[in-house]
Amino acid sequence: MSNKDYKKLYLVTDYRIPFNELLEKTKEALIGGVSIVQYRAKNKKTKEMCKEAKELKKLCDEFGALFLVNDRIDVALAVKANGVHIGQDDMEVSIAREIMPKDAVIGVTVHNKEEALKAIKEGADNLGVGALFSTNSKDDATLMTLETLREIKSVSNIPLYGIGGITPYNLNKDILENLDGVAVISALLNSDNIREKSKEFLNILSK
């Protein structure tokens, strides 16, 4: 198996955690093997977001990890992030592609095959698929069936990252065979030992 074939562990930050604490937790996750970090901040001022994103980008650069910003293309551009992740209610992928640098990574959250096909056609580089399990991070998350996940996999030629309530204990073979990695928040950031929890995830993803 080549490096590009390894399933990836993707951390999404939690804006409810004080930033200095979040920075330290993110570092532990990166040491543990996280290879993608998405900065997600709600109800924060742009100046504060830019400051935080800049520090996280610097940290990700130290570990050779990809750094993405959720929703806010302006913040992503300001801190020279590697890309953005956008949802169904955000800017169209095609417009984001025009604004972002040519080599920028654009991820999109999708919930069904139709949304996946549209995102791929418009130039998405990866898809966040879910929610696979119930989650406290997004109140309005609708659970995705295994059948829907398989439908998306069947039409996708770009990486798929599972999202929503994922832990090392609820991932099974049927789910994993349709994913290229998983994106997590609470399962890592609420762990007593983030570094070891990251390694635990990667061990499961490597099977």
Curated annotation (Swiss-Prot):
Enzyme class (EC, first level): transferase
Protein name (record): Thiamine-phosphate synthase
A GO CC term assigned to this protein in UniProt: cytoplasm
Gene3D superfamilies, per database record: Aldolase class I
EC number: 2.5.1.3
Alphabetized GO MF terms: magnesium ion binding; thiamine-phosphate diphosphorylase activity
InterPro entries tied to this protein: Aldolase_TIM, ThiamineP_synth_sf, ThiamineP_synth_TenI, TMP_synthase
Binding site for 4-amino-2-methyl-5-(diphosphooxymethyl)pyrimidine: 38-42, 70, 109, 138
Pfam families associated with the record: TMP-TENI
Residues bound to 2-[(2R,5Z)-2-carboxy-4-methylthiazol-5(2H)-ylidene]ethyl phosphate: 135-137, 165, 185-186
Top-level taxon: Bacteria
Cofactor: Mg(2+)
Function: Condenses 4-methyl-5-(beta-hydroxyethyl)thiazole monophosphate (THZ-P) and 2-methyl-4-amino-5-hydroxymethyl pyrimidine pyrophosphate (HMP-PP) to form thiamine monophosphate (TMP).
Binding site for Mg(2+): 71, 90
Co-factor remark: Binds 1 Mg(2+) ion per subunit.
Catalyzed reactions: 2-[(2R,5Z)-2-carboxy-4-methylthiazol-5(2H)-ylidene]ethyl phosphate + 4-amino-2-methyl-5-(diphosphooxymethyl)pyrimidine + 2 H(+) = thiamine phosphate + CO2 + diphosphate; 2-(2-carboxy-4-methylthiazol-5-yl)ethyl phosphate + 4-amino-2-methyl-5-(diphosphooxymethyl)pyrimidine + 2 H(+) = thiamine phosphate + CO2 + diphosphate; 4-methyl-5-(2-phosphooxyethyl)-thiazole + 4-amino-2-methyl-5-(diphosphooxymethyl)pyrimidine + H(+) = thiamine phosphate + diphosphate
Keywords, sorted A to Z: Magnesium, Metal-binding, Thiamine biosynthesis, Transferase
Pathway as given in its UniProt record: Cofactor biosynthesis; thiamine diphosphate biosynthesis; thiamine phosphate from 4-amino-2-methyl-5-diphosphomethylpyrimidine and 4-methyl-5-(2-phosphoethyl)-thiazole: step 1/1
Family: Belongs to the thiamine-phosphate synthase family.
SUPFAM superfamilies: Thiamin phosphate synthase
GO biological process: thiamine biosynthetic process; thiamine diphosphate biosynthetic process
